[in-house]
Every structure is written in C-alpha cells, then in structure tokens.
Amino acid sequence: MKRSLILLAFLAAPLFADTVTFKVIGIDCASCAPPVKKALASVSGVTNVKVDTEAKTATVDVPSGFDKAKLREALSNAGFDATFPGEKRADIEPLPADIVKSLDIVRYDGKSALDIGKVLAHGKITIVDYYAGWCGPCNVLESRLERYMVAHPDLAIRRADIGKWNNAAAAQATHFGAEALPYLRVYDTHGKFVASVTGGMWDEVLAAIEKAGR
C-alpha cells in the first residue's frame, strides 16, 4: 500500500525535465527583476524562476515539451520580450499594425498644446507621451507600452510629437518640467495627475501605472 501511494504521488507530480535560460529584452535596471519574475511565475508549469539583471537573463524549470512561446507571451504582457538560444533579436519588436490599431492610442502632431482635460480617456489610466520620431528610446518605449496594453485594456495613450523641441507640444512639455525624452505623464481613471517619468526606465513606468490604478 505504501509503495502504491509513493508511485501515485510520483506519477501525479510534474516531470520537470528542462531548465531553460534565455535573454530578457528590456531589463534596464535591478528593479526590473520583480516584474519579470512575477510574469514568468504566472505561467502554468513554470517553477524555480531566477532573474539575473546584470546578465539580463532568466532561468526557469519547465516540463518536458513545454511551449516556450508561453514565456514570451507572459513577458510581452509585462512590457518585456525574450530571446531564446538560437534566436538573434536585440530589441523589442513592434506589434503588427492591425493589433496597434485595436489599442486606445491617439496621436497629435504637436502644433497645438494638448487640452489635457479633453484628451484623457474617461474611466482609463491615461499616459500622455511627449515624444519625437528622432528619439530612439521613445520608439523602444512605444513598442513596450503597446505590448503592455494588449493585456491591460484599461490603459490609454495620448502621444504628442514635440518635433525638434520647437512646437507647442514641446513648450507644454517643458512647462510641465520635461528635461529630456521620453517624457510621460500618467493620470488615473478620474483624470487626476499621478506621476511623471523621464527617460523611459521601465520599472518607473510600471510603478507609475500601478500607482494610478490604486
């Protein structure tokens, strides 16, 4: 009887045959470890999650035959991405155009200052993003935010192009205190200003969004 119980327990336990280590795209500081770990730990079948922020890697135990696409999806929903052994990707890739069109994103040319009260999305956390096409970090942050929005429909983005720091949107951003790009201002679901983020550090962006959702 005892031997049978041991056998049943063994059969019921998942067979963790594989340990997978892979690059996590988007880790830019030690504070990124908790959201990466949380995202990976949420995937069914994943155990023993370890994140190395210096090497920008994650290591997980998964069952034999596990679909690694689930890891990438979980990271994407948290604003990160994954590069598995054999792949050659260095940056977070933009979403397909049809998916981007389904997100609550409105772009403004920056020729006029934004009427903040009018552009905010009622009932949603709204990020007002002052950006420029020549700003590389702005483009990376844009892709991260769009991926994050896929799993967070309560989020909206209003993007204002500051040109070459020479238009109305640029003057407005400067008035708000922007000293560099990317520059975000986060508002809660009631339209109350919560926080600003300069530089696009992802842990700070996530913290601002979380604060707005309280």
Language model regions located:
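N-terminal targeting signals for Sec/Tat export/insertion, comprising classic cleavable signal peptides
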Residues: 23-70, 77
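A short beta-strand-turn-helix
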Residues: 17-18, 105-125
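N-proximal helix/coil linker or "cap" segments that precede and/or mark the start of modular domains
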Residues: 77-106
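Short pre-active-site segment immediately N-terminal to redox-active cysteine/selenocysteine motifs
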Residues: 25-28, 123-126, 130-134, 180
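Non-catalytic, surface beta->alpha helical segment in thiol-disulfide oxidoreductase systems
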Residues: 73-76, 180, 186-214
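Typically the conserved alpha-helix immediately C-terminal to a functionally engaged Cys/Sec
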Residues: 37-43, 137-151
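Thiol-based oxidoreductase modules, predominantly thioredoxin-like and allied folds used
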Residues: 51-57, 130, 153-168
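Sec-dependent N-terminal signal peptides
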Residues: 4-15
